[in-house]
C-alpha cells in the first residue's frame, strides 16, 4: 500500500525541468502513472495530452472508420488513440519514447503480442492537429516516426493534409489542399484512399 502511494506521488504533474530525473523517465516509469491523466513520453520527458476538441474527434473517428472498413478481411489492423506505441522498445522497459498516435495501422501482428502496446513502428500513422499539438506533430513526432521507420505519416489540419513517406531514407513531404484534393490515397495500402469530402461534411456539424 505504501509503495503504491509512493508511485502515485511520484507521478509527474508538472513539466519543470528540475522535476524530471537527469536521464528522464522510461516506459517502466510510465506504466506506474495510471490512466487518470494521459501522457506521451518523448525522449524521457512527459507531455500531457489535453482533451481533444469535437472537430478533432470527428475527423479522427471518420478516418479510423474508413480505414477499418477498408481493412476488413485484410491482415493489417487499425487502432485509434489512446493506444500506446513504443517506437524503440527495450526488453527491460528502459525505452524513453511512448506515443499515442490519433490513428495507426499495424501490419505485423508480432508487434501486438504483449497485448498492452505496439512494440515498434506502426506502418501508417495519422495525427490530427490541434492548437496544443501542431508544433509537436510537425517536429518532434515527425522526426521520431521517420527514425523509427514508420512507412507513411500524415498530419491532418483544417483544409490540408501533409503526407510524409521515405525517399532515400528521408521523409519527403507532399501537401494536399483539401479544397482541391478531396480523396487522398494511402500509398502503403494500395487501393485504399481517405474521402476527406465526407470527413469535412461530418466534421462541420454544429
Where are these regions (language model features)?
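Gly/Pro/Ser/Thr-rich low-complexity, intrinsically disordered segments predominantly at protein N-termini
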Residues: 1-206
Amino acid at each position: 500500500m505504501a509503495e503504491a502511494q509512493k508511485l502515485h506521488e511520484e507521478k509527474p504533474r508538472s513539466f519543470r525541468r528540475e522535476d524530471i530525473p537527469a536521464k528522464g523517465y522510461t516506459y517502466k516509469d510510465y506504466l506506474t502513472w495510471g490512466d487518470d491523466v494521459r501522457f506521451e513520453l518523448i525522449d524521457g520527458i512527459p507531455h500531457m495530452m489535453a482533451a481533444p476538441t469535437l472537430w478533432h474527434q470527428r475527423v479522427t473517428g471518420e478516418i479510423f472508420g474508413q480505414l477499418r472498413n477498408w481493412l476488413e478481411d485484410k491482415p493489417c489492423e487499425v487502432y485509434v488513440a489512446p493506444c500506446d506505441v513504443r517506437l524503440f522498445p527495450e526488453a527491460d522497459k528502459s525505452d524513453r519514447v511512448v506515443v499515442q498516435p490519433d490513428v495507426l495501422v499495424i501490419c505485423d501482428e508480432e508487434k501486438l503480442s504483449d497485448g498492452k502496446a505496439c512494440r515498434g513502428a506502426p506502418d501508417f500513422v495519422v495525427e490530427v492537429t490541434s492548437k496544443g499539438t501542431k508544433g509537436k506533430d510537425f517536429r518532434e513526432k515527425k522526426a521520431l516516426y521517420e527514425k523509427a521507420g514508420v512507412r507513411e505519416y500524415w498530419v491532418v489540419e483544417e483544409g490540408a493534409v501533409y503526407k510524409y513517406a521515405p525517399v532515400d531514407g528521408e521523409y519527403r513531404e507532399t501537401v494536399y489542399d483539401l479544397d482541391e484534393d478531396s480523396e487522398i490515397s494511402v500509398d502503403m495500402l494500395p487501393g485504399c484512399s481517405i474521402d476527406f469530402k465526407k470527413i469535412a461534411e461530418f466534421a462541420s456539424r454544429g
